[in-house]
Amino acid sequence: RRLLRDLNIEINQIIPEGGSVKDLKNLPKAWFNLIPYREVGLMTAMYLNKEYGMPYISTAPMGAVDMAEWIRQIQKNVNTLALSLSSKRVDYEPYIDGQTRFV
């Protein structure tokens, strides 16, 4: 959560944590899904991708290299989806550099 906050990304839902059946209606509102653990949530993400065209990221952000790749995938999804709303793009490379510089 902290990392997403650092990137100014608002979390729509965390499923199953604290979720209820009535919260499920909000799932299609997300721009994309993050699946930090492939064992949990991958089938749901695949379903949402099939039904709603919602992309998902299933790279586990464990270690500096995977975390950097995870953030780059987030950046790619945000920039792709933001094109329809604005010409503004995000660049998370300075954040990645700051987080991985001394590793």
Curated annotation (Swiss-Prot):
Keyword terms: 4Fe-4S, ATP-binding, Chlorophyll biosynthesis, Chloroplast, Iron, Iron-sulfur, Metal-binding, Nucleotide-binding, Oxidoreductase, Photosynthesis, Plastid
Cofactors, names only: [4Fe-4S] cluster
Cofactor note: Binds 1 [4Fe-4S] cluster per heterodimer. The cluster is bound at the heterodimer interface by residues from both subunits.
Record carries keyword Metal-binding: yes
Top-level taxon: Eukaryota
Subcellular location: Plastid, Chloroplast
Pfam family, one: Oxidored_nitro
Subunit structure: Protochlorophyllide reductase is composed of three subunits; ChlL, ChlN and ChlB. Forms a heterotetramer of two ChlB and two ChlN subunits.
Name listed for the protein in its UniProt record: Light-independent protochlorophyllide reductase subunit B
Lineage of source species: Eukaryota, Viridiplantae, Streptophyta, Embryophyta, Tracheophyta
